[in-house]
Amino acid sequence: MKLLFVSPRYYPYTGGVEYVVKSIAERLVKRGHEVNVLCGKSCINKPEENVINEVSVIRWPVYAPGDAYHIPRMRNSLKRLLLESVKNYDTVHLHSVHSVLTIYSLGTLKDQSIHKVLTPHYHGTGHTFFRRIFWRIWKKYVRNVLTNVNVIHSVSEYEAQLLAMDFGINPVVIEHGVDDWILEVAWNPSDYVMYSGRIEKYKNIHRLANIVKHLNNMGIYLELKVFGEGCFKRKLKRRLDKIGIKYELKPPQTYKEYINYLSRANLFGLLSEKEAFGQTVNEANAIGVPVIVVEPWGLNFKERTRTLITKLSKSDEEVAKEIAAFLEEAKKQPKPEVLSWNQVVDLYFKILYSP
């Protein structure tokens, strides 16, 4: 099979969507399929092509203010490329309705007979005031192009509910997987709480720090390790200094180093207001690291052991008390069951890529 993926960005950028696309694309190549990726890159003036682990990648010039939107430049040339190249593919799999590059590509291909799959990675709205205003307008355009897709794939039950509510569609739900070797990694807890991902205000890392402070006051002495980049990083550092806990604030790690840190975390916390799924939670679950998440999106993990689901409306002190009890209980529970990426690829072929 010949497949084209459209993604906001691609490796070596290490965002959540890009990680998912890379995980699927490279496994398809290993199974003998031909895979190309069309993605955006904001610091170039003309398209670039390269091959990464046998996946052919075309990086298209985009505007990405605030590391968002991914608005394609040279749109006439992009349109010609898409219309010409789809003649050579069996399936095009587009990722993220929050990316203009993705929706522009889908609109360009709306009348083409190629099998089209869309994974929206949808979380309902934008993360800032301006982005929320923009999303109200953008949503109307997204609604129009969704009618031209053969299969809409949701990564979680919560995302599926949002898509049904906002667009009146019922997507196929297939959750993300993890690398097979991660399933063999043992949990060896140390004395820290961990967060890894984008450092944005809506991720509520500052609240996680407050919770660690309350745990320390309760006699549970843990530090906080934060890995990532984002526009809230400087403000977060000031808040961490003010809170007065022991912490480390580091840039994103290599994947193996990230997993090494994760396997030694006493607790992984993701208190984000909005997530389509939460891949870091998936990886923590696969290792057996106790995790705290929040409603509503955290309900994706309601059937999993060693997972505490709480509400952002609770005070940080209340959440700390929940965690104190949870950490004792989690040690007695079995490790959660998590799919591998190879199992997920099997489901993609069976459900998403079959005409």
How would you name each of these model-derived features?
Residues 4, 153, 184-213, 225:
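Conserved donor-binding/catalytic core segment of Leloir-type glycosyltransferases
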Residues 183, 314, 318, 328-355:
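A charged, aromatic-enriched C-terminal amphipathic alpha-helix characteristic of glycosyltransferases
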Residues 45, 91-113, 117-125:
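An aromatic- and histidine-rich active-site surface loop
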Residues 135-152:
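Membrane-proximal helix-turn-helix segments that form the acceptor-binding/catalytic region
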Residues 235-253, 309:
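Nucleotide-activated donor-binding/catalytic signature segment of Leloir-type glycosyltransferases, i.e.
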Residues 273:
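Aromatic "clamp/platform" in nucleotide-sugar-dependent glycosyltransferases that forms part
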Residues 41, 158, 177:
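Carbohydrate-associated surface elements
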